[in-house]
């Protein structure tokens, strides 16, 4: 347990993240901050009143300012507008870049030693904005992408094979968008390669559904986007850091030569511990996977160049 974790943004993702952080008692205090007056206060009060029922002692508070977030050990940034039907993650670029910039400026002055987990979309570029504005080292700025994309991939495989999701081992790398790279060569069910259990055509359909997993939910909801699975993914990253678990999780990290790529955030296997990013694991990829990762990197670089800081 750490002393304080802050969640920026009291929308569906932020509020659900705060609730799960409190239920897991990962921090003595969970702070939810949002510009909408009354929203974080009301949701935090509601969550705190669930404590006697759920049996947690983490205090949940809501605020519109950053003073109560001061000296947070971990800050999860979920602030920004959500995707609407027909809107790509990149359509969110300009609006959310401005929001994340303002948030990062506040964080820099109130919690200069915090570890940041960025959830706002477009994820890879917003992670870049947060690192650039705060000046934090790459060990303390991570993007939540691969954990969520991998969860979707695993869920679809488990559904197709009618097996437990717990027996699916998989990893999705690359950008958090249409160019993400599910690694077929590292996908297995209790150690059995997925290619021995499923025809290629069926696997291809799952790969495509994984890439459009977020858009599929947006299409159903019509007025919002996913939040249960994204919040679970963010909390899993927080848990790995708080408990110093040394988990190997696919996260968006700032690359400095790994996989032959530099100067961008991209989903790669990361070892997470109490210091944040402890190392990036370079796994052997097939030629097709390497090419796909390079293509994904190109797709991330393009909107990065359009960001004005």
Regions inferred by a protein language model and the residue ranges of each:
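Rossmann-like NAD(P)-binding element
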Residues: 53-115
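N-terminal Rossmann-fold NAD(P) dinucleotide-binding loop
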Residues: 14-15
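Conserved N-terminal Rossmann-fold NAD(P) cofactor-binding segment
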Residues: 33-73, 301-309
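Extreme N-terminal starter segment of soluble prokaryotic enzymes
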Residues: 2-5
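Rossmann-like NAD(P)(H) cofactor-binding subdomain of soluble oxidoreductases
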Residues: 88-154
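C-terminal substrate-binding/catalytic lobe of Rossmann-fold NAD(P)-dependent dehydrogenases
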Residues: 134-140, 149-309
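Glycine-rich Rossmann-fold phosphate-binding loop(s) that bind the pyrophosphate
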Residues: 10-11
């Amino acid at each position: 347990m750490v002393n304080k974790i802050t969640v920026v943004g009291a929308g569906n993702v932020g509020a659900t993240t705060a609730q799960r952080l409190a239920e897991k008692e990962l921090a003595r205090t969970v702070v939810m901050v949002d510009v909408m007056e009354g929203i974080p206060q009301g949701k935090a009060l509601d969550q705190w009143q669930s404590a006697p029922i759920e049996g947690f002692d983490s205090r949940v508070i809501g605020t519109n300012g950053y003073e109560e977030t001061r000296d947070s050990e971990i800050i999860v940034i979920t602030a920004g507008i959500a995707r609407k039907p027909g809107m790509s993650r990149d359509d969110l670029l300009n609006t959310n870049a401005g929001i994340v910039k303002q948030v990062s400026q506040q964080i820099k002055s109130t919690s200069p030693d915090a570890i940041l987990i960025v959830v706002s979309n477009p994820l890879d570029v917003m992670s870049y904005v947060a690192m650039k504005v705060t000046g934090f080292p790459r060990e303390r700025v991570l993007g939540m992408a691969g954990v969520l994309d991998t969860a979707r991939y695993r869920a679809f495989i488990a559904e197709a094979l009618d097996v437990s999701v717990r027996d699916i081992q998989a990893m999705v790398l690359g950008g958090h968008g249409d160019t993400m790279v599910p690694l077929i060569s590292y996908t297995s069910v209790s150690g059995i390669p997925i290619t021995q259990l499923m025809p290629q055509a069926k696997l291809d359909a799952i790969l495509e559904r994984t890439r459009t997993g977020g858009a599929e939910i947006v299409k159903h909801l019509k007025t919002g986007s996913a939040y249960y699975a994204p919040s679970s993914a963010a909390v899993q990253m927080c848990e790995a850091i708080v408990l110093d678990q040394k988990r190997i999780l696919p996260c968006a990290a700032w690359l400095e030569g790994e996989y032959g790529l530099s100067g961008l955030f991209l989903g790669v296997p990361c070892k997470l511990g109490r210091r944040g990013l402890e190392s990036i694991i370079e796994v052997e990829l097939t030629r097709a996977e390497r090419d796909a990762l390079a293509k994904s990197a190109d797709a991330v670089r393009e909107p990065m160049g359009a960001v004005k800081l």
